[in-house]
């Protein structure tokens, strides 16, 4: 007897349809799984056999061939345990059900027949809906994630026995309630941190506000204990709330990476990823024998924070250049390649020198000019070229620390950021960009033209401050964002002056 069960496989952050074809015939005994399975799938024979024995079913002494089609697509993971087990039961006439043809099955079987959660559920359910399937059977711990997708019934089961009872219509089922319609995308109480927690540092907070408003990458240079990490961790709290599309994309990435905990659904808060400086290239950009998303993709639609940036290996930092420029990462293997989104805001921090006290107001730096220069050279020019804002962070004074003055909250800053982003959305409507940081040179001439006064100001600054040529476009982009924060139609001299002040590391005399 032949039977076909619907399932799926993950490719990048999307899913493709996989048919689990089961054929039972004479002429031998055994279970044979074909169709480019990995070792996890090959081991499913033992899990399925034990689950049958502990659930009251039998693996008949016949030749059972399971084909995972299409055969040229690599399949991996334990999510095929359930569709294979159901297919064998139907093909051996131990189970009959009218639900098979229009249902998808995903889940890992334990030896006692219970179901365990799997990763990649959200893209799999989205694919099931696109294929016109009516329902998806899955482990209960994945239900909250699956219920993000509307238009398909999500049915959580705890064991093989419970599933068979439902399929045989001996037990009623209640589909999970879909969560999208009840989600408030503008919810502001998602974060525990707040800008109001940080005393002083108005100059740095202003720079972070500009970075959030225009999607600009930013680097903070300051001595140890000046508050760089504390400020960086509060960046997501002032960024605009994620749109539904952004939330779905973010959830898909974390789902594929297996980073969504049990019983968790749509991710609403912007990601904040802070990899250790010993992180490898693969961990940072993604990869592996079977590619998985790296930190740059897990930070998609959020923040990637590189604390003490010069401590990262130079080869590790250099691989950031492609995702910073293209906002996605391509991982190639011999026979295929996968793309992962990598549209993140980079926040980097660093000490100004090896000892950490160059330009400190009270402590003396013990580093030579040459050692400061060598330390700064750990970050290459092409990588620094992709960072729009450089801001020096000075230690908070005792006066500011003891002040009772109420600091501005993240909600207040976010209101201005959202207004500026709305202006940019209108400006770039119909284009494939959505914020000022994404403009190229031709777009700058169109959307951020300079008056004669501003052009002369920028030219004088380039000469007097010895700014490098690569700073020119960056300054204009940041100035355009500053103008947006003030709801100004054109860039004015004060906007340009402030933007020029955010190019500390471009000055040729830095560290000398």
Predicted features by range, described:
Residues 40-45, 58-60, 67-77, 290-291, ...:
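Basic, amphipathic alpha-helical bundle interface domains used for macromolecular binding and assembly
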Residues 59-62, 99-100, 132, 150, ...:
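Short loop/turn elements that form and flank the Walker-type P-loop nucleotide-binding site
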Residues 171-210, 214, 241-296:
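P-loop NTPase nucleotide-binding/switch module
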Residues 301, 307-308, 319:
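Walker B catalytic acidic pair
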